[in-house]
Amino acid sequence: MRFVAPPPRSGDNSPSPSPSSGISEEILSRSSDPPLEFSPPLIAMVVVLAAAFLFVTYSRLISRRFLSPLFRRFRRWRCRRRRLLHLSSASSASTSSSDLRSFSPFPFDSFHYSSYSPYGLDDSVIKTLPLFLYSAAACTGKPAVGKTSAANCRDCAVCLLEFEEGDYVRTLPLCFHAFHLECIDEWLRSHPNCPLCRTAILGSAGVLTPMSPFVPLMAPRIRPSLDDEENNAIIIRGEITPSRSNWNTIAADTTNDQEIRASVEEQSSPAISRFRELKRSYSFECERESESERVTMEPATVSPWRYRRSTWNKRQSPFGNLISKSRVFSFRYYRSTKSPFFRRRSSAGVFYPISERIPATGSSSRRTKSMTSPMFFRTAPHSSSRLRCGDPEALLSPERWRRRDTCRAEM
């Protein structure tokens, strides 16, 4: 069978559209759409961010180039102004309040804050320290082994400011730390060491460490100062001691020479010996005895129980009249009240162990000898805790010397 195609219709005579014509139509349709519009809030946000970025960048550039030197100069000017104000106030105070300055414990003529500490260095010593001009080109140097090079110090540790080209820098001799000239000079007037590492400026042998002028308020009651009296006694001794030429003229006779030396020592030595004995008694909390007294007191002082008693006994404070009851815990007192091995003898007022009150039969120990010594029972009623504590009032009281004289008379 054959299929016959139908004849074309009259309306289908137009040609089919080509693909190029379809693409052009799509482009025309897209171009006819309305353009994209940005909202005003979005535009405002973008503008604000851009302005902030420009402002921060500009401020950083200005602060690095211009503001940091201005702030540095302003701080230096303020420090100099403060120093001038202190100096002017010190000069006015020195002229108007001479009585107050004489009462002040500081041996200085001005009230400048740098002179409050007596441990600083003198200006003549400070001026001997090396002085340099700072150079940024020298910052590339490497420090020595175990030391810090001045070239690596880019800022001052006192004022916390960076060094500038041409600044006067003072370098410390031992630690090689560098600081501004004005900063380190002001520091060294009140401190003898480095602000960073605390290294002594002049070494251990050259540090100026005078004695502190501060004196405790309660020192005269507890321990009087005997340094001035000892120095005066030494000066008097130097005045009394004859010169070497006088000794050579007197040395013709040996006996006369010895007599003169003995007389000079008798005139000057009692004061010095008394002061030294008192100072040692304050240190060891006991009084120095002569050789004869030590020999006679040997049986009463060699007992280990006596040392234990003096060690654990409750000390009385020299300010006992101000305190109603002692708050210091005493192991000796607590043990004596709780332990059955200790009994109290009401006549002597001293605690004795049972082994010492009733010595063992058949043998005698040093402890029993010390307890049976007549000197112990003579001195026990007269013993004072103030003497054991090293109270100066008890050491210097006439009652103590009267008791010693009575003890010697009884011997």
From Swiss-Prot:
GO terms for biological process: protein ubiquitination. It catalyses: S-ubiquitinyl-[E2 ubiquitin-conjugating enzyme]-L-cysteine + [acceptor protein]-L-lysine = [E2 ubiquitin-conjugating enzyme]-L-cysteine + N(6)-ubiquitinyl-[acceptor protein]-L-lysine. Residues 1-32 are annotated as: Disordered. It is an enzyme of class 2 (transferase). Pfam families: zf-RING_2 (PF13639). It is a single-pass membrane protein. Its main location: membrane. Pathway: Protein modification; protein ubiquitination. GO terms for molecular function: transferase activity; zinc ion binding. It comes from the Eukaryota. Residues 10-21 have a biased composition (Low complexity). The chain crosses the membrane at residues 36-56. SUPFAM superfamilies: RING/U-box. It is found in: Membrane. PROSITE patterns: ZF_RING_2. Keywords: Membrane, Metal-binding, Transferase, Transmembrane, Transmembrane helix, Ubl conjugation pathway, Zinc, Zinc-finger. GO terms for cellular component: chloroplast; membrane; vesicle. Gene3D superfamilies: Zinc/RING finger domain, C3HC4 (zinc finger). Belongs to the RING-type zinc finger family. ATL subfamily. The RING-type zinc finger domain mediates binding to an E2 ubiquitin-conjugating enzyme. This is RING-H2 finger protein ATL65. It comes from Arabidopsis thaliana (Mouse-ear cress).
